[in-house]
Amino acid sequence: MAEQELRNYHLNFGPQHPAAHGVLRLVLELDGEVVERVDPHIGLLHRGTEKLIEYKTYLQATPYFDRLDYVAPMNQEHAFVLAAERLLGLEVPRRAQFIRVLYSEIGRILAHLLNVTTQAMDVGALTPPLWGFEEREKLMIFYERASGARLHANYFRTGGVHRDLPPKLLEDIYNFCDPCSQVLDDLEGLITDNRIFKQRNVDIGVVSQEEALEWGFSGVMVRGSGMAWDLRRAQPYEVYSELDFDIPVGKNGDCYDRYLCRMEEMRQSLRIMKQCIELMPGGPVHVLDGKVVPPSRSEMKRSMEALIHHFKLYTEGYHVPAGEVYAAVEAPKGEFGVYLVSDGGNKPYKCKIRAPGYAHLQAMDHLCKGHMLADVSAILGSIDIVFGEVDR
C-alpha cells in the first residue's frame, strides 16, 4: 500500500469575515480542527496617518486621531493634545480638565459596550448587542451635544476643549449614570453565568503576567492577568489623581476574565463621570492665550487683533518649541501613546502613534496555538481589535 502524506490545512479567516472586527485577514494552519499557526495579515486599512500629520498644522492634525480607534475617538485626541501641551508648556484650565476626563470615560463605556456585546455575539449570543447599542446611542448623543458630531468629534484642542458644554448637558449625563448601571446588571445577568458563554471563554487565550509584559500588552490585557497597571493611577494625568475609583483585575488571564474586567471598568467609569459632574468647577474651558486658541466669534466682531489672530491660527497655525515628548493615556484598549517631535515649526516633524491593538494582534499566534478553530473568534473578540489604530 502506498504511503500517504498528511498535510496541514490552510484556511483564510477574513478579510470579509463577520467575526474579524474589520479588515483582518488571518491565515490559519490547522491540524484537523486544532490551530497550529496563526499569521495575521495587516495593512488593509493603512492610510498613512503618521506621514499625513507631518504635512498638517497641529490644529489640522487633531481630527486624524478620531479616525484611529473610531469606537472611542476622544481618547485618542487626548494623547495628542497632551503631547502638544507639554511641548508648549501650557496649563489647561481645571474646567477643561474635568470635561476631558468626563468624555474620556464616556469613550471608555462606548468602547467596552461595543466589545463586550460583540464578544458575546462572536460566540453565539444575539441579544446583548441589541441591549448594549441602546445605551451606546444615548452616549453618542452626549458626544453630539458637546461637539456636534456623533463619531469624529474633534472636540479636544491644544489648551482645552473646543467650547463649553451646553446647558443641561451635565444634568442629563448625571441622570444617565444610574439607569446605565442597571442595564449593565441586566447584561451581566444575560451572559456572565451563561453556560455556553463560559464554556466558550473560560481557559481560552490564557496570558500569564510574564507573557503580557514580554508581548508589550497594556490595558485589559494585563489587568485580566492580575496586574493592576492603569495609567490613570500609575502616571496620573489631568485630574485623575483627585478622583476615587478602583482598578478591576482578573486572576486567570483568559477571555472570561477580560470580559469581567471590562464589565467592572464600565461601572468604575460611571463612578468617575458622576464625580466629575459633582466636582465640575466654573471658569474658562481653554487657555486664554490668543496665539494658541482661536478667539470667540463675538470677540472677532469687536476686535481687529482677534480677527488677525484667527486668520493666522487657521492659515499658518501656532509654532511649537523644538523638542520631543511622549504622552500616553489609558485608552479603552490599553496604553495609547503619541511620541511627538517638533523642530520649532508649525507642523510636527514626526508623530509616532503607539496603538495598543497592534501589540495585542501580534500575539494572535501565541494565544491561539493549540486551541480549536472556533476559539479563534472568541480570542479575537476578547483582545478588542479595531483596525483604524492597528493599520493607521
Swiss-Prot record:
Keywords: Cell inner membrane, Cell membrane, Membrane, NAD, Quinone, Translocase, Transport, Ubiquinone. It is a peripheral membrane protein. Its main location: membrane. Pfam families: Complex1_49kDa. It is an enzyme of class 7 (translocase). One of its GO terms (cellular component) is plasma membrane. Its EC number is 7.1.1.-. The keyword Isomerase does not apply. One of its GO terms (molecular function) is NADH:ubiquinone reductase (non-electrogenic) activity. The keyword Calcium does not apply. NDH-1 shuttles electrons from NADH, via FMN and iron-sulfur (Fe-S) centers, to quinones in the respiratory chain. The immediate electron acceptor for the enzyme in this species is believed to be ubiquinone. Couples the redox reaction to proton translocation (for every two electrons transferred, four hydrogen ions are translocated across the cytoplasmic membrane), and thus conserves the redox energy in a proton gradient. Belongs to the complex I 49 kDa subunit family. NDH-1 is composed of 14 different subunits. Subunits NuoB, C, D, E, F, and G constitute the peripheral sector of the complex. This is NADH-quinone oxidoreductase subunit D. The lineage of its organism: Bacteria, Pseudomonadati, Pseudomonadota, Alphaproteobacteria, Hyphomicrobiales.
